[in-house]
Amino acid sequence: MSPEASAAASLPVPDPTLTVERLLASAAALRPRLREQQDESDRRGYYSPEVHQALMDMGAYRILQPRRFGGYELGCEAYVRTVLEISRGHPASGWCFALAGSHAYMLAAHWPPEVQGELFGPRGDFRAAMTAGAGGTWQRVEGGYRVSGLFPFASGIPVSTHFMGTGVVPQPAGPPRLMHFIVCREQLSIEPDWGGDDSMGMQGSGSNSVRLTHAFVPDRYLVPADVMLSSEHLPEGTHGTRLHGNPLYLGIMLGWFSCEFGAILTGTAHAAVDEFTQLLRTRKMTFNPQLERKHEPHSQGTLGEALSRTEAAEALTFAATRLYEAQCARFGREGKPITKADTLQVWSISREACRAACEAVEMLFRAAGASVAKRGARLQRYFRDVQMYRIHIQSQPLFPQMKGLLALDMPLPPPFG
C-alpha cells in the first residue's frame, strides 16, 4: 500500500450489490418521467427534486467516484451509458447530470488524499459543476487566496455540492499560473440566468453562472491545469492512481469530456428517432389522409438514415470511451503515458459521434413537418438542444487544428503546447 493510500480512510458504499446492468435499467426506467417533465424542467432550468433523488438512490452520481470514498468505481463506459439513457429521456437533464456527476472523477485523480477526504466528506456526497474558462480576481492571503468573479455556464450547478473553476492565479515566485480550484456550495451564489428563454436550447441543463465574492480557496484546493491533454509530465502517475490503485484515475480530461458529449448527443438522437417514429405511426399523409405517414417512402428513408447515424454515433461514443480506458490501463501495465496525440484521437472519434448525432436530429426535424415548429414540440426541443453543441468549444476548429499541428510535427498553441 502506498503512503497516500494508507493516509486516507475508507467509506462504505451505499449498495454493495449494485451492478452496471441494474444501474442502466434504473436509468432507462426514468425515461417516461423525464419526458413527462421536459417542459417543467426547461422552465425551471434543471431537473426536478424527484429526478435528483432518483439519481441519488440509483447510485448514478457515484459511478466514477472511487470505492475508498463511498463510490462504485464502475468506470467510464458505465458512466457514458447512463448519461445516454438519461439524455434519451431529456437531453438537457442528461447534460446537467453528466457535468455535475463526472467531476468526482477529476477530484479523485488530481487532488491530494487529504483534500479528497475533506471534500468527499463523511458520506461521500460530492457533485461539482465546472467551468474551464479562466476567471476571477485573485488576492493572496494567509493559507490561500480570496477569489471574486463571475463564472458563466457552470452546467449542473443547481444539483452540485461544490464548484470547480479555473483561474490565472498569482504565484509567490514566478509568473501567474493557470490552475483549477474547488469551493463549496456555501461560498457561492447561483445567478438566475438559465432556464426558459434565457437560452436557445439545453434549457434544463442547469448552466447558470456562479458568482464568487471573496471566496476563500486554500492552497491545497488548487492544482495546476496541465492535465487536459497529456500525462507525459506525470511519470509516477497522479494522486489518484497511487491512492486508489486504479490507472483509470490518471484523469486526462479533454478526451474523457468529449466522450460525455458523445453520450449526451447520442441520447438526444435516440430521443429524436423515438419521436419521429411515433409521428410516422400516428400522423396522416398530407395528400392521402387515409394513410399514416409510415407508408410514405421519403419518411421511411429519412427514419432509416437518421437511425443509421444514431447507431453510428453510439458505436463511436463507446469506441472512444473504451479507447480512453485502454490508454489508462496501458499506463497501469507498462507505465506508458497518455500523449497529446492519444487524447486527440479519443476526442476526434467522439467528435464524429457528436456530428453524426446532430445530423440525425437535424434531418428528422426538417422532415417532420410544420407542427414541430410550435412551442412544446419535442423534435423542436431536440433540434434546439443539438445546436447548443454546435456552438460549444468542443465542436469548434481549435481541436482539429491541434490534431493537424501534431501530424505536421508543429508545436501546439498555449496553453496546450
Spans of features found by a protein language model:
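Glycine-rich beta->alpha junctions and the first turn(s) of the following alpha-helix
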Residues: 209-310
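DPxDG-like acidic metal-binding loop motif
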Residues: 150-196
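Charge-rich, acidic-biased intrinsically disordered regions
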Residues: 51-54, 113, 289-297, 326-345, ...
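Generic structural signal for well-ordered, non-transmembrane alpha-helical segments
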Residues: 25-28, 267-270, 304-311, 347, ...
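Glycine-rich phosphate/cofactor-binding loops in nucleotide/flavin-utilizing enzymes
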Residues: 368-417
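Basic/polar N-terminal segments that are highly enriched at the extreme N-terminus
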Residues: 1-25, 29, 416-417
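C-terminal helix-coil-helix/basic helical segment that borders enzyme active sites and/or dimer interfaces
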Residues: 35, 39-42, 312-352, 365-368
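Glycine-rich flavin
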Residues: 47-57, 62-161, 173-176
